[in-house]
């Protein structure tokens, strides 16, 4: 395995401002190798099928315990990486609007620092497609050592992250194929599910709503 630090150093040496810039440039230069396949399926039909897969999984999940922890936590730390950061940012903003103290460091180093300050009174939410990102796994280990409970949102059922989690919210598997970069649709559905459960179970009685 190659560490995230090594990858960032390589990206900087290649004069890219960020890994995202490097990835976009790589995709552009390899564009001729990608095949555009006509799936013969209406776009709305395709979206509907994908959404149904995740909704069917969410129907069989009970996260009432996690919702209780989120509401009563001293603070909620959100951990993620890559494209999932956009989803995590939405979750962080909405939790804050609900009056829940939310910590969302955009930098891995600050994420480590925040994890070391966690106590059993805090709660952690992790968003990861594959559940194996080393930096996030390390942060989760620190959180567990500090007595925190963790909610994982992931596509993969069995992973290093799932073994460290107290609550797991699985979503349907998506694919990246050439230009068809995954939009994190399933992750968006998952956080919307969490937010609505928060409202339904607890927040209607709060004065700020």
Segments from the language model and where they lie:
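Helix-turn-helix/homeodomain-like alpha-helical modules used for DNA recognition
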Residues: 40-98
